[in-house]
Amino acid sequence: MKVLKPVACVLGCVLALSPALAAQGQAVLEDAWVRALPPTQANTAAYVTVRNPGPEPLVITGGSAALAGRLELHDTVEVDGMLRMRQQESVTVPAGEAVAFAPGGLHLMLLDLERMPAAGEVLKLCLEINGAPVCTDAETRRGQASPDREHQHHH
């Protein structure tokens, strides 16, 4: 019986951590960045690509970011010829696929900022994926494109 207690404890700890380990082991956050806006603004947007190399869907239900009072998932939709932002309760990343949070579509709203981050400043960005946080660094940038897009030449 004395041997079973430590085994049960270890097993219990592993099971308690399994959602976090599963999310961290499967979700890959790439190309995260935050849009730099004038310092008078209280909100801004963040962008990231979420890859799911795993066999099960990933569900993003929210997150957090340094300097932000809260983070919301939003989509840009056309309503009566006007572009509108709509809050999303969740975003699903199918198995083996990726979802891009990018300008003009799905994006992350960073609301109630303590202050606007300066261009070049790096913020910690975390998404709640399958019930566990998955974090990355996001550089604050001016403009709308990622560095890769800014340096491409079109002929």
Where is each model-derived feature located?
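Positively charged n-region of N-terminal signal peptides that target proteins for export
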Residues: 1-6
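Sec/Tat signal peptide C-region and signal peptidase I cleavage site
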Residues: 18-24
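Bacterial N-terminal signal peptides
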Residues: 8-18
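Compact, glycine-rich, soluble single-domain proteins
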Residues: 24-155
